[in-house]
């Protein structure tokens, strides 16, 4: 997959070069992707959605190489290791990456909250047990299909002095891994007066009752993954409740509700899924700079490829930054609230930026000539676009991610942290030019100032412009923040690369190349921020008037941002010339 310098640069960008275990995981996943996944794609494995022997062979290869047991084999956090495996597999096919991840998604809540007995039984991968996480879409009691989809539990049998038996009724939709799952972690809600609240409960095929793996789901992408609509009507002991339960006045009360159990799981996996999607962008660019890659024809617009490359690097940087922070959080026994909130925000922002960028950029790339993979498959970019659109729905659609980001970005602690980030970057910008740092900090200050103004603006009735009900205001500001966070993460990664370039003996051109890419990413982010801030601040002027003082302050900030764009177009041209020269090698 790599040009001679590509891996070294990116391992250092993402802070994994010094971790032999992480590099080994990435190389293992790459080997499986090339030797097990790619041949199946060439043979037409994406042509059908049913679970076949050929797809089972891919799963067996993932098992044999330890890629389905990463969760139980690392002591330094699991998000970065899973992210690297997903990156390499999604480079070839998103469905293969889903095969690797879905079991971990189900097991994470057991790892975080399970009893010792549950961990011993369900996290021991010596016999390669596979798991599935069965939620409604997305959680019990939520969504337009809540009545049809949500699951429930009640006491089925309760002999005094013995453990209660629970009756579980659950219907799932679009559930991965069900064709071969050895157990299922299902979200259910209590619906009688003998049980209280919601929980996650572990189900096994041998339990009394109906364990129906469900009908096959017809999908436009991720065909290598198993996906069905399962049905469960089972009796299980109450000890299967993840995290155990308490007896209060004769009522079964789970120790944790399903939202608490899934919170760290979703935090990690939003970062991981963002990296799966970002991988698709760079997999389109990389063949153009690999002299041995098989590309044909001349791309119609090199500048568009520059935009795609910069977006892919920024998406990957934000995703890996969120994964590292998630690992740091997991390794702390009592993490601060500030760190927890920041990790949740970055994970949601990473997923939103990756999915929203990938679908647009890959749609443009589909019109280019010359961007074919090493196997020459004509459906290469089309398949990646379809997979990216499906990934945009995992763990909640883009609207949900925007809602999470817009709610978190007005937190006082985060806004203080955001100001600190801006000041830190300004100090770097005084030392280094040509990276677009000044441009990025101007955009960050404009966004922060505009957010404050929007939150203060009211109409004649005292109604605030910035409120949950007015998503036409909150969502564009959330999108703008995600672009800024992605550009910031990429800038910090490039600064890290500059620190170690001499020590790692990286090619001299990589610094200037990634400086230019960082400048392009910052320019793109600042342009979208300036447009969104102007539209939101003045676009509601008829009902939310803006004072002359506010207009002057905004004009001053935007003028500084415009001047800071100096050199960004030249950086874009230099990258385009580099791509053209590499393509002609």
Q: Each PLM stretch: what is its role?
A:
Residues 118, 277-284, 288-334, 340-373, ...:
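Extended, hydrophobic alpha-helical segments in both membrane/secreted and soluble proteins
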Residues 216-313, 389-485:
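Glycine-rich beta->alpha junctions and the first turn(s) of the following alpha-helix
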Residues 435-585:
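C-terminal amphipathic alpha-helical interaction region
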Residues 163-215:
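A short core secondary-structure module
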